[in-house]
């Protein structure tokens, strides 16, 4: 192991898992006692998170579209999730496919996803810890058009949360930490 790479696995191996766990628990116990955030600090932090100007959309009835387009129904059920605002959904775009390192996306695909974020959301996309991309504020009325654009670009793979949505290291060819 390379001790100059900041990796938890190296620390755990040096300390032993038991000692590492004890140190984590001790730090947590100390932090939970000393961490105090007052209302003024919370209000100041809240100023940094201006809410988007959501439209007053209604939830959509996709019954007819689901009957006509079973692939859309499958994608909707797997790759979209409830949103806190009525009439919106969160869409997860899978970056997993055969023959490509998980999470890899070409510049053309990323430009397309950015354009779709501009067209169908507030211009925001997020990378996820699952090595995917999320469009978090998609109006339900635009889901079918978004799915069609993703499908045309081979980005509408419906396997979020399944074994094929694996999270893994892309290996030494792509990551300097692969051999740490």
Please tell me what each predicted stretch does.
Residues 1-180:
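Peripheral terminal and linker regions in Fe-S/redox and tRNA-modifying enzymes
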